[in-house]
């Protein structure tokens, strides 16, 4: 388990990378990482491409503040829930890309199924493009406690592996370390972009593929 300073440094670098990819406009999204004392997370309303160490909060795994004076994001609770649900998860990156936002909005099902893409094999646990990747989709909800409960209920019968989509909102990518999360994030964003382009070309509604 890494210390707070190391985790913050890695998240600052991740913020620059994600910002350059244009997956997190304005001050949206939030990043977190597990630490020896709990986890660190970006404060509310921060430009993720220009993060400094003062823009992070340190919390324990019950959500109790340990350090930091800036405003806590309401979405902190969802990060906390993901860490509690997935003990091996060490990092969560929440982004607001166009592809993730639009696909989650037009997909009427509560999951986005993707198959046939070679890049699926870059996700932990996948060995073939013939396998089906299912990313759960949850309706956006300003009541984060309620949203977290829905995510928890889903995880009980269908464990969350690579991330979750929030409808019309964005992606929460998870992994066993920050490098794995960055890989998962990049792969998922690539797949979302491919699927969105495919739907534009074929004219097939996303809901038809995810009944």
UniProtKB/Swiss-Prot annotation:
Cofactor(s), by name: Zn(2+)
Binding residues for Zn(2+): 94, 96
Swiss-Prot/TrEMBL GO biological process terms: L-methionine salvage from methylthioadenosine; monosaccharide metabolic process
Catalytic activity, EC: 4.2.1.109
Gene Ontology MF terms in the entry: methylthioribulose 1-phosphate dehydratase activity; zinc ion binding
Keyword Iron recorded: no
EC supergroup of this enzyme: lyase
InterPro entries cross-referenced by the UniProt entry: Aldolase_II/adducin_N, Aldolase_II/adducin_N_sf, MethylthioRu-1-P_deHdtase_MtnB
Keywords, comma-separated and alphabetical: Amino-acid biosynthesis, Lyase, Metal-binding, Methionine biosynthesis, Zinc
GO cellular component labels: cytoplasm
Cofactor remark from the record: Binds 1 zinc ion per subunit.
Family matches, as Gene3D superfamilies: Class II aldolase/adducin N-terminal domain
Pathway where this protein functions: Amino-acid biosynthesis; L-methionine biosynthesis via salvage pathway; L-methionine from S-methyl-5-thio-alpha-D-ribose 1-phosphate: step 2/6
Reactions catalysed: 5-(methylsulfanyl)-D-ribulose 1-phosphate = 5-methylsulfanyl-2,3-dioxopentyl phosphate + H2O
PANTHER family listed in its UniProt record: METHYLTHIORIBULOSE-1-PHOSPHATE DEHYDRATASE
Similarity comment text for this entry: Belongs to the aldolase class II family. MtnB subfamily.
Function: Catalyzes the dehydration of methylthioribulose-1-phosphate (MTRu-1-P) into 2,3-diketo-5-methylthiopentyl-1-phosphate (DK-MTP-1-P).
The protein's name in its UniProt record: Methylthioribulose-1-phosphate dehydratase
Organism: Pseudoalteromonas translucida (strain TAC 125)
Gene name of the encoded protein: mtnB
